[in-house]
Swiss-Prot record:
Designated name of the protein: Zinc finger CCCH domain-containing protein 39
Compositional bias per record (Basic and acidic residues), positions renumbered to this chain: 151-166
Keyword Zinc included in the entry's annotation: yes
Stretches with biased composition (Polar residues): 20-37, 72-85
Organism expressing this protein natively: Arabidopsis thaliana
Zinc finger (C3H1-type): 104-131, 183-211, 269-297
Disulfide bridge positions per record: none
Biased composition (Low complexity): 43-58
Length: 386
């Protein structure tokens, strides 16, 4: 029994890998091509040794067959197909058809590159510099095809705006502040006045009127005022700046003061005071345009000039009817004549009072300092005047 038992017992226990030990597995994984023949030889040897013991092994523990997929990792992944879209894609995808996506590649400048904020670098679809700029193909319109209807409408609107821009040129040339004042005063719509499309349309709370209409109305008003002032000045060529200022008060239009040959405006106080720079240094950087007198020869009398201008102003007020001096004095009311005469009397009294106190001997009697100058026991012979 001992001999039969020893003969029926297998010589070794088969590993679950079909006769493969750990050392052979590592060597085969390291060099699969070189060890192909050795693997086949070891497999055949293990099969020959396991033949007497196949009856004692279960059916599931049969030797594992050699598969090429074991030594080719790339082939172990299932290939994607149309029937199995969930499969993992291959490492090298097929080239994508460019079509119309890349015909405009680097045909325009990159706006972010100009601002210095482009993060795409060389992968950017726009040109980074003039040397990187390309030209689109000549038949790009045929490749792209006709644009949608919405884009055609936008282009038509842009063309209409381009056509309307020359008509808006006078608006730009005029004073911007005047236009803003007209818009605020008349409550006009800003977008409509400057040629833009108002998003509110007929529901807008502001008036949709052309700005040039209100500008023309204000221009006509100014022109009529200037014409009336010019006619008045032409009727009286001998009037001075004060007369023009009086007319300006009636017409509420700014009228420039009279000018000399050099184009310098002569004010009311023209050459009425000496130039300090000319008196100290003998030179003035303004020259003949200086408003101050360079020497006594150029000095004017300011009082006489003001009185003359006042007379001209009175003449401009009474320009419709010229009345002689005697008749004008006779036509004055009694109260006005009395007031004029009383005013003259007051001025005469003031002048007499100044002349009366002009003597130094009389003035020094006002204060009490002269008492200290008298000798002790001496009294003043002249009474103090009040």
């Amino acid at each position: 029994m001992d001999s039969s038992y020893s003969d029926s017992r297998p010589m070794f226990v088969q590993s679950p890998y079909g006769g493969w030990n750990q050392t052979q597995m590592i060597d085969s994984m390291a060099n699969p091509m070189n060890n192909e023949q050795g693997d086949l030889h070891s497999l055949s040897e293990s099969q020959s040794q396991s033949q007497p013991s196949q009856q004692l092994q279960p059916a599931l523990k049969r030797p594992r067959l050699v598969d090429d997929n074991l030594f080719n990792p790339a082939s172990s992944f299932p290939q994607p197909s149309s029937s199995n879209p969930w499969m993992v894609p291959s490492l090298n995808p097929p080239p994508v058809n460019k079509g119309t996506a890349n015909i405009f590649y680097k045909t325009r400048m990159c706006a972010k590159f100009r601002a210095g904020t482009c993060r795409n670098g060389e992968l950017c679809n726009f040109a980074h510099g003039i040397e990187d700029l390309r030209q689109p193909p000549s038949n790009w319109q045929e490749i792209v095809g006709p644009p949608p209807a919405g884009q055609d409408r936008e282009r038509e609107r842009e063309r209409e705006r381009e056509r309307e821009r020359p008509s808006l040129a006078p608006v730009v040339n005029n004073n911007w502040e005047d236009d803003q004042k007209i818009i605020l005063r008349m409550k006009l719509c800003r977008k409509f006045c400057f040629g833009e499309e108002c998003p509110y349309g007929d529901r807008c709370n502001f008036i949709h009127e052309d700005l040039s209409k209100f500008r023309e109305d204000s221009g006509k008003l100014r022109e009529s005022s200037v014409i009336s002032v010019g006619a008045t000045a032409a009727d009286q060529p001998s009037d001075t700046a004060s007369n023009l200022i009086e007319v300006n008060r009636q017409g509420s239009i700014p009228v420039p003061a009279p000018m000399n040959n050099g184009g310098v405006v002569k004010t009311v106080y023209w050459k009425t005071r000496l130039c300090m720079k000319f008196d100290i240094t003998g030179q003035c950087p303004f020259g003949d345009k200086c408003h101050f007198a360079h020497g006594q020869a150029e000095l004017h009398n300011s009082v006489g000039r003001v009185e003359g201008e006042a007379m001209n102003a009175v003449a401009s007020v009474n320009k419709q009817a010229v009345v002689p001096a005697n008749e004008a004095f006779a036509m004055k009311p009694i109260t006005q004549v009395t007031a004029d005469s009383s005013g003259l009397n007051e001025e005469g009294r003031r002048k007499k009072c100044l002349l009366k106190w002009s003597d130094s001997k009389k003035i020094n009697r006002i204060y009490g300092d002269w008492i200290d100058d008298l000798p002790v026991g001496q009294k003043s012979t002249k009474p103090v005047e009040s």
